[in-house]
Amino acid sequence: MLSHANFIFTIFIRRSVNNLRKLVQVLRTDRRVAKKILSAYLNLLSAYPDQPYGHEPIRNPFVPEEDQNVLSAPKDIGSADDLQPKDEVLLDLIDRKLQEGERVIVYTAWVRLDTQERLHKLLTEKGVKAAILDQKVPTVQREEWVDKRVHEGVKVLITNSALVETGLDLNAFTTLIFYNIAFNLYVFRQASRRSWRINQTAPKVEIYMLYYADTMQHKALRLMASKLSAATVIEGQISDEGLAAMSDCQDLTTQLAKEL
């Protein structure tokens, strides 16, 4: 009998986002404004590397005049028709996995971006049969919906990780790729286990996380790594692989106090 293994890999891509950093000065010098825009700022820093176009400006909520309250207007770099560096890595990885006879799940998290439709278009243009599982499919029907698509020959399933975090067996898909992550540790852990069920017969399931180095995506993943490291120690699981290996958590008590 083959022994089963579950592997987690992180893949980083480099990209410059210098044009967003000027907001840091505002956040450091005006606490009142910072409290109002911090969430929008962090979301922008996380999403911009994946989609460097089409973002609304961040405005000072205490200045009513629209022509004077723009704190940062993210510069458009390209358009939806351009292939982004992460797209290239994703498509190469999917191509390799399909050649090995596997099916692939691509998880996306940023609901305000056009990621799912764009990736579906890219895959379709390459002749890959892909499907998008969205929230329009009722929760109780999602597993049946996926099974039907598999029988129809779908090789790549694109969905939001939050839609499959509980209750689904997705054993037909043995490669899981997080194109981006919502940085919710519970959702990540649940979604990453959808293909690693008790009735899984494949010898291995591989999980990949794509991120741009030296960006908010990178920092958030390191934070999640520390949380995952702490969680697995509490549960009695010690791991030096995958996401947990990104953690610089040395002292468990200190890390829990700082980041949980």
What are the roles of these predicted feature ranges?
Residues L157, L176-I177, S195:
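Short, well-ordered beta-strand core segments
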Residues F9-I13, V17, W145-V146, A191:
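A structural signal for short hydrophobic/aromatic patches embedded in well-ordered alpha helices
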